[in-house]
Amino acid sequence: MTQQRPIAVLGGGSFGTAVANLLAENGHRVRQWMRDPEQAEAIRVNRENPRYLKGIKIHPAVEPVTDLLATLNDSDLCFVALPSSALRSVLAPHAELLRGKLLVSLTKGIEAQTFKLMSEILQDIAPQARIGVLSGPNLAREVAEHALTATVVASEDEELCQRVQAALHGRTFRVYASADRFGVELGGALKNVYAIIAGMAVALGMGENTKSMLITRALAEMTRFAVSQGANPMTFLGLAGVGDLIVTCSSPKSRNYQVGFALGQGLSLEEAVTRLGEVAEGVNTLKVLKVKAQELGVYMPLVAGLHAILFEGRTLNQVIELLMRGEPKTDVDFISTSGFN
């Protein structure tokens, strides 16, 4: 009997670790690659990722490794959970090894220099690979603690979607499929910006009306932008859009929410990110999204307002006053009503 090939998870962060555990619990051998040999040794010895998922036991079938070449050679299904700033530099030298492999991005970010999503970078590096993304309301710790969770795997490759569903679907983790890879991935990247705003609002003691307004206007804003890029607006009414937006803007477990909360408490951006100790993709996404929205002429007042606070020296009160005095627009303007006649 031929032994099953291991599944690779690239990245030693919280979500990569949670996904590695899920795969192992479903009976798969998993190789989790990380750069830091000390982190790999700590997981190997203590069966715990103390920096990113303290208190969560790592399944015995998860093997922490630091040899990327061997990991890629041995696996045909790879989940990529690398920070957006590192993905290209880590994988580009090994482009030939990625030919024909199934590469599924778990990273919700945008590359600063190119405004490319992670799956687009994977396609640049390995045009012969089969590409997908996994996104949705998936807080890493809750996934690791087996809270009931649903996610979306998106790809034009139906067989890839089925393979990922079979690998991850379990008693507490439900995997839906979508063909709108771009929309699913864009939703996951954009919502990080609005989670920072939501965290600030909570820290400042703003009411439930305000939080509801922020979330719904954020949905309108991010969908408006996505539609301008060719995404399907209906994608944003599902798990990868409104689902991910709600959980990220409502939970103190969200990294971007934590950054916003710290900012609302009076910390500087540098202090807030240092306190977090992990990558908060929303900060980087905000910078490139503000520029791109201006280039395209897409109306994104919440993005402009947060950028003004973090990078242009404006106070929160100044931005709030400007936003509330702005001319009201149509409530839902990103779906044509002709489609519902």
UniProtKB/Swiss-Prot annotation:
Active site per UniProt: K191
Positions annotated to bind sn-glycerol 3-phosphate: K108, G136, K191, D244, S254, R255, N256
GO annotation (BP), single: glycerol-3-phosphate biosynthetic process
GO annotations of cellular component type: cytosol
Annotated InterPro entries: 6-PGluconate_DH-like_C_sf, 6PGD_dom2, G3P_DH_NAD-dep, G3P_DH_NAD-dep_C, G3P_DH_NAD-dep_N, NAD(P)-bd_dom_sf
UniProt keyword Oxidoreductase present: yes
GO molecular function (one): glycerol-3-phosphate dehydrogenase [NAD(P)+] activity
Residues bound to NADPH: S14, F15, R35, K108, A140, R255, V279, E281
Keywords: Cytoplasm, Lipid biosynthesis, Lipid metabolism, NAD, NADP, Nucleotide-binding, Oxidoreductase, Phospholipid biosynthesis, Phospholipid metabolism
Catalytic activity: sn-glycerol 3-phosphate + NAD(+) = dihydroxyacetone phosphate + NADH + H(+); sn-glycerol 3-phosphate + NADP(+) = dihydroxyacetone phosphate + NADPH + H(+)
Cellular compartments annotated: Cytoplasm
Main location: cytoplasm
EC number: 1.1.1.94
Family (UniProt): Belongs to the NAD-dependent glycerol-3-phosphate dehydrogenase family.
Role played: Catalyzes the reduction of the glycolytic intermediate dihydroxyacetone phosphate (DHAP) to sn-glycerol 3-phosphate (G3P), the key precursor for phospholipid synthesis.
UniProt name for this protein: Glycerol-3-phosphate dehydrogenase [NAD(P)+]
Species per Swiss-Prot/TrEMBL record: Pseudomonas fluorescens (strain ATCC BAA-477 / NRRL B-23932 / Pf-5)
Encoding gene, per UniProt annotation: gpsA
